[in-house]
């Protein structure tokens, strides 16, 4: 076959192939013979909802609020049951168990924020673990409000029992045989001196923070995921061994919040003056105690990032803090 014939054949074949339609045209009737399928509705991502944005921005405050709320529900609740039943539904060790459970469950609830549940613990984390100082007032306010809300719930739940115990509706006493103010906040034993009151709270708070840092230290044995359970035994131990003299408040939010609620509910100004104006000691001593407990642990045991493990033991940072000191010094998650 001549080359020209072959070329003609190939050319003709190419023409025929190129003439094959690549798109099938549909008539108007065919186009609309079937209803178009609806596209699936995809909900917007959670961050686009207004409440989701609020929850994200206020996550720490909500976590501390509800964590402290749960702590006080169990803590004040067990005191109410033991006191108002006149010891028939529990005893002093029941109170230690109840507070231990309250802390454990509160840490589970408030774990996203670190589960501090205590302004003094938050302070220690700001001082020694790089927790942002700008978050300290947010945590403290949320903790106090959570404690107040829980105290109000406990009061509402036990109001009838309080009336019966006190001797009638509207009778509310702070000191005396039928006093019920101690259900909500702590009052010292009658024999305690002012110095003894302070050091009782100081020592218990020092133990609290020292052991918390030990359990949170991954370079030590550490509690890991069992941290809430470890805190249960820690609080139970403090209550069982150091709680009699002052009631082991060891927490401004736990004491001041319910004390304020009891004042508002009719217990009167004696909630502030009782025990020689004892009310300020649970507000101040835990800060000194937790700071000292954290200091002791970092000086003698801790080897991780801490102002104690810097030149001058962090004193230079205290007298001339850098901006990072007030945001997030170590860029690390704050332990409990």
UniProtKB/Swiss-Prot annotation:
One Gene Ontology cellular component annotation held by this UniProt entry: plasma membrane
Motif (NPA 2): 251-253
Biased composition (Low complexity): 9-19
Motif NPA 1: where in chain: 118-120
Segments on the Cytoplasmic face: 1-64, 116-135, 217-223, 302-336
PROSITE patterns: MIP
GO molecular function: glycerol channel activity; water channel activity
Known catalytic reactions: H2O(in) = H2O(out); glycerol(in) = glycerol(out)
Subcellular location: Membrane
Pfam families: MIP (PF00230)
Positions annotated with a glycan in the UniProt record: 178
Region annotated Disordered, chain positions: 1-46
Null mutant phenotype: Leads to no variable phenotypes.
TM region(s), chain numbering: 65-85, 95-115, 136-156, 196-216, 224-244, 281-301
Gene3D superfamilies: Glycerol uptake facilitator protein (1.20.1080.10)
Key words, A-Z: Glycoprotein, Membrane, Repeat, Transmembrane, Transmembrane helix, Transport
InterPro entries assigned to the protein according to its UniProt record, in alphabetical order: Aquaporin-like (IPR023271), MIP (IPR000425), MIP/Aquaporin (IPR050363), MIP_CS (IPR022357)
Primary location recorded for the protein, binned into one broad class: membrane
Positions in the Extracellular compartment: 86-94, 157-195, 245-280
Role description: Probable water/glycerol channel that may have redundant functions with FgAQP4.
Record remark: domains: Aquaporins contain two tandem repeats each containing three membrane-spanning domains and a pore-forming loop with the signature motif Asn-Pro-Ala (NPA). FgAQP2 has NPA/NLA motifs which is in accordance with the fungal aquaporins (NPx and NxA).
NCBIfam families registered for this protein in UniProt: MIP
Classification via PANTHER family: AQUAPORIN OR AQUAGLYCEROPORIN RELATED, AQUAPORIN-9
Family: Belongs to the MIP/aquaporin (TC 1.A.8) family.
Protein name listed in UniProt: Probable aquaglyceroporin-2
Gene from which the chain derives: FgAQP2
């Amino acid at each position: 076959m001549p080359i020209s014939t072959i070329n003609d054949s190939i050319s003709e074949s190419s023409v025929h192939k190129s003439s094959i339609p690549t798109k099938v045209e549909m008539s108007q009737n065919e186009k609309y013979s079937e209803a178009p399928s609806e596209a699936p509705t995809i909900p917007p991502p959670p961050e686009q909802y207004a409440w989701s944005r609020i929850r994200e921005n206020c996550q720490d405050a909500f976590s501390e609020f509800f964590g402290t709320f749960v702590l006080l529900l169990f803590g004040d609740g067990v005191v109410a049951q033991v006191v108002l039943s006149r010891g028939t539904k529990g005893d002093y060790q029941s109170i230690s168990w109840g507070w231990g459970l309250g802390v454990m469950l509160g840490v589970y609830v408030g774990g996203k924020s670190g589960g501090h549940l205590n302004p003094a613990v938050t302070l220690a984390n700001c001082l020694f673990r790089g927790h942002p100082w700008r978050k300290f007032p947010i945590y403290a306010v949320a903790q106090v409000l959570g404690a107040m809300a829980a105290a109000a719930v406990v009061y509402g739940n036990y109001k009838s029992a309080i009336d019966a115990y006190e001797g009638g509706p509207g009778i509310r006493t702070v000191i005396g045989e039928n006093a019920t103010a101690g259900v909500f906040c702590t009052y010292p034993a009658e024999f305690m001196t002012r110095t003894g009151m302070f050091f009782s709270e100081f020592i218990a708070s020092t133990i609290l923070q020292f052991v918390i840092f030990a359990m949170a230290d991954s370079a030590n044995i550490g509690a890991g995921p069992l941290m809430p359970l470890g805190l249960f035994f820690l609080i139970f131990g403090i209550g069982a061994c150091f709680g009699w003299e002052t009631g082991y408040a060891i927490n401004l939010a736990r004491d001041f919040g319910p004390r304020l609620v009891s004042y508002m509910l009719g217990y009167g100004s004696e909630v502030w003056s009782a025990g020689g104006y004892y009310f300020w000691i649970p507000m101040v001593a835990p800060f000194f105690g937790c700071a000292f407990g954290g200091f002791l642990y970092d000086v003698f045991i801790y080897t991780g990032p801490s102002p104690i493990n810097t030149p001058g033991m962090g004193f230079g940072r205290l007298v001339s803090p850098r901006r990072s000191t007030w945001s997030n010094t170590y860029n690390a998650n704050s332990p409990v």
